Structures are given as C-alpha cells and as structure tokens.
C-alpha cells in the first residue's frame, strides 16, 4: 500500500473508532431510553464497519488511526451531577455521586431523540464524505471497502433525515 492509501485508511479507521467512542459514551450518559437504544444501534453499525476495516488491515491498525473530529465527543465525555455539580468522566461514571451520594441517574443528560438523529445525520454525511475522499486515494479492495462504507453512511444520513422528519411532524 502506498503512503496516500495508508493515510486514507488511518482517517477511515479514525472516523469509525471516533463514532464508536461517541455512541458508547452518549448511550451511557443519555437519560431517555429511546435515545439510549438509538445510540446503541448507531454504535453497532459503527462496530460492524470496524470489523470490515479490521478484516482488511488487521486489528493492530487501530493504534495508528487518525481521528477527524466528526463527532461531538466533548458533549458526552464528561457528566455533571445535577444536584451538586460534581463532574466525572463518562467512561467511569459511578453508581452514585462521590460528593453528595445521589444515584447515578443524576449524572445523566436529557438528550432529545431529535438531537440524537440530528447528530447521526450530520456525522454520517461527514463520514460518508471522508470515506469517499479516502477511497479516491486508494486502490483495489481498499477502495471498494471505503466506497461501501461511504454508501452505508450516506444511507444512514438519509435514514436519519427521515427519522427527523417523522419526529418533527
């Protein structure tokens, strides 16, 4: 693989890994069960994309991934207790607040289902563009896979748009 194809794969892997990280954290921090389920499903789709990429390049390639900052990770990486204001990392959210003793749910965020689908639509469009751009710098199986991932994310963006239209009607 030439350098441009290797870079294309690093960016594609980063986009998928960033998506997985975002959806996992968002699912943990969301208060609404419907939003949790939506983020869980979206995360599964990204995990399936990761499996396809790993089949091509190997699991160790994750170490060299370049994260493109497509997802609003900062919005879900920390959680604040709404009783006392104590802040924790979402990855290690405790079962109760270490400061005031309230239950875990005091760290959860009210994320509207429309917001979840807005994020899915926007990030899917951006990642579809990234996959297509990466495919342009690639050849053979790599190019075919990146084009496939681009189509998957374009379809997801369209699906998210339909979900949004339904929710808003």
For the regions a protein language model found, what residue spans apply to each?
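Non-heme di-metal
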Residues: 1-169
């Amino acid at each position: 693989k030439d350098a441009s194809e290797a870079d294309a794969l690093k960016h594609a892997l980063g986009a998928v890994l960033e998506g997985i990280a975002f959806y996992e954290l968002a699912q943990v921090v969301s208060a609404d069960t419907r939003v949790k389920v939506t983020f869980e499903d979206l995360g599964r789709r990204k995990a399936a994309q990761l499996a396809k990429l790993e089949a091509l390049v190997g699991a160790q390639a994750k170490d060299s991934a370049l994260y493109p900052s497509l997802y609003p990770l900062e919005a879900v990486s920390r959680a604040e207790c709404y009783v006392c204001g104590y802040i924790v990392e979402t990855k290690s959210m405790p079962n109760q607040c270490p400061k005031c003793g309230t239950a875990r749910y005091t760290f959860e965020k009210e994320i509207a289902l429309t917001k979840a689908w807005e994020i899915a639509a926007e990030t899917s469009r951006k990642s579809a563009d990234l996959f297509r751009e990466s495919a342009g710098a690639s050849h053979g199986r790599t190019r075919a896979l990146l084009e496939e991932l681009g189509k998957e994310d374009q379809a997801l963006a369209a699906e998210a748009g339909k979900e949004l239209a339904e929710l808003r009607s």
